[in-house]
């Protein structure tokens, strides 16, 4: 779970990211031809642990973009952003923002796993036993742990927005469809949440309720 994934896989096997990024840019150019609209793809660099990982891959992505632009004789407009999945990333937020990452998304599933050293795939019986013994009251993979993982997210937001107030921040995974978690995200001024398609109606309703409650509390 913790080794050859995300940006690490890209760095070890450069042909993978080259193929993926090239496909994104070529598809964007073709989409512009078909629709007549400007397409701006957003390329995510996942599982960032250090700033150098991000800057290394950012440069490589830019090289692929230039290569495709020359081949297709078409300038590509794109954005590069990062997925935040490791606790360490919370403490280098301002450095990542400074290195021209324009968007960030918290992958709260992996952030929960790496913060608590729990795997959602094989800890079901453990969590059930913990709830039975009142060691925990809720499943942290269903409802965001605001005191642990939530604290990391708050630190990250503060550091990132201190560097750039306009930075776009959001979360993805099933916490994005949990009403209580959405209320927490709204209070911390995240720009968006993402979740499985079947949870989207719940997410929209919960986001609206969270915003209404926030406005009421300010009056």
What are these regions (language model features)?
Residues 1-219:
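Conserved alpha/beta-domain cores
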């Amino acid at each position: 779970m913790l080794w050859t994934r995300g940006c690490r896989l890209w760095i070890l096997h450069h042909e993978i990211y080259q193929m993926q990024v090239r496909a994104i840019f070529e598809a964007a150019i073709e989409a512009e031809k078909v629709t007549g609209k400007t397409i701006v793809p957003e390329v995510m660099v996942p599982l960032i642990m250090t700033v150098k990982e991000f800057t290394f891959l950012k440069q490589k992505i830019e090289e692929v973009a230039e290569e495709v632009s020359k081949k297709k004789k078409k300038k590509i407009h794109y954005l590069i952003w990062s997925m935040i999945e490791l606790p360490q990333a919370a403490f280098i937020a301002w450095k990542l923002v400074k290195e021209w990452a324009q968007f960030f998304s918290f992958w709260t599933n992996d952030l929960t796993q790496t913060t608590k050293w729990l795997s959602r795939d094989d800890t079901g019986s453990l969590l059930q036993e913990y709830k039975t013994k009142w060691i925990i009251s809720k499943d942290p993979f269903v409802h965001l742990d605001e005191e642990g993982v939530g604290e990391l997210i708050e630190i990250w937001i503060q550091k990132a927005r201190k560097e750039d107030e306009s930075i776009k921040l959001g979360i993805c995974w099933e916490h994005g469809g949990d009403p209580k978690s959405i209320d927490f995200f709204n209070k911390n001024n995240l720009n968006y949440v993402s979740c499985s398609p079947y949870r989207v109606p719940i997410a929209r309703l919960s986001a609206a309720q969270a915003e209404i409650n926030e406005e009421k509390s300010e009056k």
